[in-house]
């Protein structure tokens, strides 16, 4: 949603005459198999404020859209043969990466920055399943890759896997069998990764259908998985007394994990009135309460402090 409860919608199209009314960066089809698209419409869904295509000469698709508190727009998608097309004003990038994140201006008239990530082989590595921009503008991605599953859909068996994706030191799981989930946090200016890890079983074809996972605003992902296919039980479970630590199916079984990426959040916003020689200066706390256990600390600079909400 936009600042005024307006709506952003994204997707993909193979139509060379897909309508893109209003303001927007790209007004013509980029060529190739598909282009991504993004629409900004009013809250009643009867006026298009702006719209843009997002694509070049191969396969391009937008999966998710998020906005921040300034109304800036972030999209996550896949791209084949991306080369350096999606790299602009971003220190962290992978030329020819199979996934891209773009930060648009509010009116979709241009990019603030854009980057591609992945192995850099010119094909998509993961299917995105969840996307978040948190209150501090950190960018969260969840997705899965599996050559074995994608081969069943007719793709070559040597593409669309998780091997070779960047992970960070001390991450939860640093190795992959190429058929796992991938969790990532990117810095708000695309200068680097704050955290990245694999999660999945070894020698298992872990995957999921779309629309089955979410991040909350604190960066916790709730992810459903088609796990432990082949009647194994190697997908990690926790704690030991969880509902079902083993796979009780004779093939795949549904698994749900809640993973806290544990990035510290300092959330603050203030309203300070203008004045001169005020005897009393009221402070109004406009911080967004993301948890009932949130703590507040005021330091007035004169030795006085407060924990009032």
Where are these regions (language model features)?
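A sequence-level/structural motif corresponding to short, flexible coil/turn segments enriched
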Residues: 1-277, 284-299, 303
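Short beta-strand segments within Ig-like beta-sandwich modules, predominantly Fibronectin type-III
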Residues: 303-309
């Amino acid at each position: 949603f936009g600042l005024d409860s307006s709506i952003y919608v994204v997707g993909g199209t193979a139509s060379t005459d897909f309508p893109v009314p209003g303001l927007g960066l790209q007004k013509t089809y980029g060529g190739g198999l598909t282009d991504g698209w993004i629409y900004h419409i009013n809250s009643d869904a009867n006026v298009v404020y702006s719209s843009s295509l997002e694509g070049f000469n191969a396969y391009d698709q937008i999966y998710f859209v998020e906005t921040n508190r300034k109304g800036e727009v972030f999209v996550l998608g896949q791209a084949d043969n991306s080369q350096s097309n999606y790299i602009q004003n971003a220190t962290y990038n992978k030329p020819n990466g199979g996934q891209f994140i773009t930060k648009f201006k509010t009116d979709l008239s241009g990019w603030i920055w854009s980057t591609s990530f992945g192995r850099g082989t010119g094909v998509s590595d993961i299917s995105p399943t969840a996307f978040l921009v948190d209150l501090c503008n950190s960018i969260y991605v969840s997705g899965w890759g599996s050559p074995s599953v994608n081969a069943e859909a007719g793709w070559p068996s040597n593409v669309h896997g998780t091997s070779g994706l960047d992970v960070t030191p001390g991450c939860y799981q640093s190795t992959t069998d190429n058929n796992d989930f991938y969790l990532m946090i990117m810095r708000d200016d695309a200068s680097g990764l704050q955290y990245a890890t694999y999660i999945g079983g070894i020698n298992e074809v872990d995957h999921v259908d779309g629309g089955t996972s979410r991040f909350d605003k604190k960066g916790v992902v709730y992810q459903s998985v088609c796990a432990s296919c082949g009647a194994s039980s190697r997908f990690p479970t926790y704690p030991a007394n969880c509902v079902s630590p083993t796979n009780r199916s004779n093939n795949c079984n549904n698994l749900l994990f809640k993973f806290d990426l544990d990035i510290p959040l300092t959330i603050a916003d203030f309203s300070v009135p203008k004045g001169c020689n005020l005897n009393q200066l009221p402070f109004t706390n406009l911080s967004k309460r993301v948890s009932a256990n949130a703590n507040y600390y005021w330091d007035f600079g004169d030795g006085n402090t407060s924990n009032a909400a």
